[in-house]
């Protein structure tokens, strides 16, 4: 498999820039992407097998990897959930697939969001990881408008080795993440 554009960019330009910016003494101190998780909670669709299948195929099409069905650990009567019922689906992307998905997300999908002015720089978790909520799956070019039955969102978490939010933000900004000005 050929090296993706973002991996080459990371190795050739991002590592030297961040080393200089944060005065790292070792190349292994530079933050890097570890994994990207794509998650969708099913909510009301948990009782509907057809909607679960549609979600599975959509996430598989978007990420290029088969999703795992997450199940309820215990019953919650208020939400009409029994133990073992499907409550969501998720995919963990690493390596080349992660870089390929991240490249498509930054360059193709995010600009397709209606009234897009950049993503919020406040969604970091304090440890340099970023989580992004997408309201509709139509922003991904792999999804055809006619093939969906209902508009559903998904969560994308970008996990890095950064020690704090400042390092994580610098890393993602160098990758080309379109952050909104504060």
UniProtKB/Swiss-Prot annotation:
Coiled coil: none
Matches recorded under PROSITE patterns: RIBOSOMAL_L5 (PS00358)
SUPFAM superfamilies: RL5-like
Keywords: Ribonucleoprotein, Ribosomal protein, RNA-binding, rRNA-binding, tRNA-binding
Classification via Gene3D superfamilies: 3.30.1440.10
GO molecular function: rRNA binding; structural constituent of ribosome; tRNA binding
GO cellular component, one term: ribonucleoprotein complex
InterPro entries referenced in this protein's UniProt entry, alphabetically: Ribosomal_uL5, Ribosomal_uL5_bac-type, Ribosomal_uL5_C, Ribosomal_uL5_CS, Ribosomal_uL5_dom_sf, Ribosomal_uL5_N
Biological process (GO), any one: translation
Assembly information from the UniProt record: Part of the 50S ribosomal subunit; part of the 5S rRNA/L5/L18/L25 subcomplex. Contacts the 5S rRNA and the P site tRNA. Forms a bridge to the 30S subunit in the 70S ribosome.
Functional description taken from the UniProt entry: This is one of the proteins that bind and probably mediate the attachment of the 5S RNA into the large ribosomal subunit, where it forms part of the central protuberance. In the 70S ribosome it contacts protein S13 of the 30S subunit (bridge B1b), connecting the 2 subunits; this bridge is implicated in subunit movement. Contacts the P site tRNA; the 5S rRNA and some of its associated proteins might help stabilize positioning of ribosome-bound tRNAs.
Similarity field: Belongs to the universal ribosomal protein uL5 family.
Name the record gives this protein: Large ribosomal subunit protein uL5
Origin organism lineage: Bacteria, Bacillati, Cyanobacteriota, Cyanophyceae, Nostocales
């Amino acid at each position: 498999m050929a090296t993706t554009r973002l991996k080459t960019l990371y190795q050739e330009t991002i590592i030297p820039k961040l080393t200089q910016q944060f005065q790292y003494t070792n190349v292994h101190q530079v933050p890097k992407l570890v994994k990207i998780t794509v998650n969708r909670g099913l909510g009301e669709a948990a009782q509907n097998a057809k909607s679960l299948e549609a979600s599975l195929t959509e996430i598989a099409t978007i990420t290029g990897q088969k999703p795992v069905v997450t199940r309820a650990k215990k019953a919650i009567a208020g939400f009409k959930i029994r133990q073992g019922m499907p409550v969501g689906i998720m995919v963990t992307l690493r390596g080349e697939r992660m870089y390929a998905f991240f490249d498509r997300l930054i360059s193709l999908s995010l600009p397709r969001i209606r009234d897009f002015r950049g993503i919020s720089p406040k969604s970091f978790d304090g440890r340099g990881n970023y989580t992004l909520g997408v309201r509709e799956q139509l922003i991904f070019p792999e999804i055809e408008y006619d093939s969906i039955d209902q508009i559903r969102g998904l969560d994308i978490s970008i996990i890095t080795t950064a020690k704090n939010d400042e390092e994580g933000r610098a890393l993602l900004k160098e990758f080309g993440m379109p952050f909104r000005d504060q």
